[in-house]
A protein has these predicted regions:
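Short, Lys/Arg-enriched, disordered terminal segments
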Residues: 1-2, 201
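N-terminal beta1-alpha1 ligand-phosphate binding loop
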Residues: 2-24
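Aromatic side chains
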Residues: 7, 48, 56, 70-71, ...
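FMN-binding flavodoxin-like domain, especially the glycine-rich phosphate-binding loop
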Residues: 16, 24, 28, 33-35, ...
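Short Gly/charged-rich anion-binding patches and loops
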Residues: 20, 103, 156
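Short acidic active-site motifs
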Residues: 39-44
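Conserved catalytic breakage-reunion loop centered on the nucleophilic residue
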Residues: 150-203
């Protein structure tokens, strides 16, 4: 799966997030390309299965100047169906945190991009460990959403279900699900009787 990561960073925080996402994507076998947005031709995004865009916000509510050309070129190409997810670091105490992300994502939606409905916004004073953890989780969920191939979705769910950091929540979820019957192919059964693949499909 080909993944593009484009970013602009002023203090280095958004760049760190981009690197963390890149490392996670490579770890699961994706072919990853990462570049600064001010060096990218917008129409190149059509060559990728999935894109991540990372931005800082200038003057609390403005698009950074490095992303202006990228922003202006969006309306020149048909991007129907191109999948993209957004991330960035900024002042989350502000009334419009990471506003540049909202500005760019809104325009990309208008011109056909399939935009992931969750945005990863990290406070600019967050610890490196917190950034790493959130970026890894975000990258995994975006990959599941963006993949058209079942083997990728099953692979990522299997990694999450087997990961120590998810074991407690998965255990509790299974306890709840096992207590309630569900209808599957016209019959009522306990979820606990299904195979692992069926559980993944039902989630």
């Amino acid at each position: 799966m080909k993944v593009f990561i484009g970013y602009v960073s002023l203090s280095g925080n958004t760049e760190k997030m981009a690197i963390n996402i890149k490392n996670r994507m490579k770890a699961v076998g994706c072919e990853v390309y990462m570049e600064r947005l001010d060096t990218v031709e917008v129409d190149a995004l059509k060559d990728f299965d999935l894109a991540f865009i990372g931005l800082y916000t200038w003057n609390l509510e403005e698009l950074p100047y490095e992303a202006n050309e990228f922003y202006e070129e969006i309306d020149q190409v048909d991007f129907a169906g191109v999948k993209v997810a957004f991330f960035g670091a900024g002042d989350l105490t502000h009334s419009k945190p990471c506003a540049a992300i909202d500005i760019l994502s809104n325009k990309m939606k208008q011109f056909g991009f399939d935009v992931y409905d969750q945005v990863l916004k990290i406070h600019h004073e967050s610890s490196t460990y917190e950034q790493l953890s959130k970026c890894e989780d975000f990258a995994e969920h975006v990959l599941i959403w963006g993949s058209n191939r079942k083997k990728w979705r099953f692979f990522m769910w299997d990694r999450m279900l087997g990961s120590p950091k998810y074991q407690k929540s998965v255990f509790l979820l299974r306890r709840v699900l096992d207590d309630y019957p569900i209808k599957y192919k016209g019959r009522s059964k306990k979820r606990g009787t299904y195979t692992r693949t069926s559980e993944i499909r039902d989630f």
